Amino acid sequence: MASLIYRQLLSNSYVTNISDEVNEIGTKKTTNVTVNPGPFAQTGYAPVDWGHGELPDSTLVQPTLDGPYQPTSLNLPVDYWMLIAPTREGRVAEGTNTTDRWFACVLVEPNVQNTQRQYVLDGQNVQLQVSNDSSTSWKFILFIKLTPDGTYTQYSTLSTPHKLCSWMKRDNRVYWYQGSSPNASESYYLTINNDNSNVSSDAEFYLIPQSQTAMCTQYINNGLPPIQNTRNIVPVNIASRQIKDIRAQMNEDIVISKTSLWKEMQYNRDIIIRFKFANSIIKSGGLGYKWSEISFKPMNYQYTYTRDGEEVTAHTTCSVNGVNDFNYNGGTLPTDFAISRFEVIKENSYVYVDYWDDSQAFRNMVYVRSLAANLNDVVCSGGSYSFALPVGNHPVMSGGAVTLTSAGVTLSTQYTDYVSLNSLRFRFRLAVSEPSFSISRTRMSGIYGLPAVNPNNNAEYYEIAGRFSLISLVPTNDDYQTPIANSVTVRQDLERQLGELREEFNSLSQEIAVSQLIDLATLPLDMFSMFSGIKSTVEAVKSMTTNVMKRFKTSSLANAISDLTSNMSEAASSVRLTSVRSIGTVTLPRARVSLQVSDDLRSMQDVSTQVSNVSRNLRLKEFTTQTDTLSFDDISAAVLKTKLDKSTQISQQTMPDIIAESSEKFIPKRSYRIVDEDTAFETGIDGTFYAYKVDTFNEIPFDMERFNKLITDSPVLSAIIDFKTLKNLNDNYGITKKQAMELLHSNPKTLKEFINNNNPIIRNRIENLISQCRL
């Protein structure tokens, strides 16, 4: 039968190459390490109390004054107070206009009687009469002479315990503080030429603008603020004040190093990232009350924005990783609302945004180092989606929000329709935000995260602002572009190709002839015949089949087969009700029973859920038992073969994923049958189950105990023509007992006879199975 292709892939899934073996051995290799706990093994506690230690203060404190500056000689700026802070007695400062004014300031410590002291002023040894009667304050004395050979005369004094004095040039005058703290005030004494007046300071000093004279007065009377007295304040040369502050440009290209052929360029750029999510909402077949999948998909987005007056064209690709799978099942009836799987991103998820623009920074982005980025956070809020049911009120999924925070940046490659682009991949970690999401008219509410149903909330895009910097090794000749080696790119985005291929596969269902499909399903398809009809792949069948087998090895079907033996016996023994009416006839009362799988006791809410699990295992048992009857896997393999031959987009890269997905997703609504003399038991993956007589198709109570015994030893058959279809066929056309038995056993010859006779019931059933072969 056609399902032979799946069996071959499973039996040969061990095929691999030596590099895969080496990698697998490396990942599985373990080392036993013995840890000696030492003397703490008895108590588990250390013998001392551990504290947090010193807690550093992270408060940023900045100096409030312009200074201090090192002692020097300078032409004091006009309209600036020169606040001098000496630490010991003696000469403090001196100055002159070189024509008719020479002045000097000395500091006298407390408790000094009237005495003569020698100072070096204007290069000469000078004897000056000084005194300080105060026991707490220091005394600044200002001396002035009018000629080079004249005598210094005392003009003014300032007494203060803080050892601070100050003067200023303004309006061709010298202003000075006089008096005693805390009542010292400013006054002027000299008329000078501002342009030629130099001051030589012997102590550290500060510069205070005239507009802050009140602050200068406060310092003279009360002392400097505490931050200025700390040892962490280091005086600098006055020349540093002349350095102009140049604000670095956010968008600039800096040459780091350069040779004849190559140069290192540092690119600093501000950036605006706009992105949006894409999703896929797939509705199941049937009456229109079921949804099979709601998932995130990669999304490309192109836009323009202005950077430093230049219009930039940018391209982003948004994808997610680490999604959480949720489901909702409103009941077992065909008219009960259900979602088999919908994806939600939460704290354990990541969002990737690949960014590229047409600026020079991305022109030669091949050899890159020192890559860094700073980005703002963004909140992504979910919108509403109404599930349109054929009858009744529509459930609405709404709400949900996450906050994206930058978690790093790496290099990546984007694949557009025409070209591959080396780009930056910005990685964002997630934090859930208000509000939570819920589904109206259901019990599902108060769940946090962003569901895939409407992640953009009808917004055109999400936007993040920030900046990045990188150093790139580029050719010295700016006109030359470094070639991109596709063989060593970081990421190959095949999701777009797979998405287009899935759409094509789903659209090809209407082009499949039902009669030819039955013939193809009865053929023993092997790997060569499966792939031989595909264009441009015949010469690469060997390598392609190896890739297919490697991918098939990790499929859910392959994993389930390996656990078949243990799961079958345990799942079969889980159903404990002795006599229950068929679920297609009446609604079951909820019963609490137990299902033990792999030594894990799980609580099941109703019998239909158990039957669904048993039916999934029945598929595995039928799959491993090859018979002459037609199975669902034969039909799905035949549909796969037909679509592969008709496809124009299939390639060696997409083939493994398509074949693995087909084994998992084709014909999701399957029913399996066990025939016991004149009684048939039929169970579905959707939880439905029937028991009926073979000759009359009349329903009878479902004997669970009998069913438990049969599923262990009796052959399992695919219910290609299910019970409802058989009963409808018998009621409208009438069939013989022989035809009934052959249809119950899915005899391909009998099926083809009904199809060739244009029986609408059988034909519609097969067409419905073909329509369920979707990806």
Curated annotation (Swiss-Prot):
Where are the stretches annotated Spike head?
A: 65-224
Q: Where is this motif: YGL motif?
A: 448-450
Pfam families in UniProt: Rota_VP4_MID, VP4_haemagglut, VP4_helical
UniProt-recorded name of the protein:
Outer capsid protein VP4
Gene Ontology BP terms: permeabilization of host organelle membrane involved in viral entry into host cell; virion attachment to host cell
Per the similarity annotation, which family is this? Belongs to the rotavirus VP4 family.
Q: Domain of life, per the record?
A: Viruses
Species of the source:
Rotavirus A (isolate RVA/Cat/Japan/FRV-1/1986/G3P3[9]) (RV-A)
| Residue interval(s) of motif DGE motif | 308-310
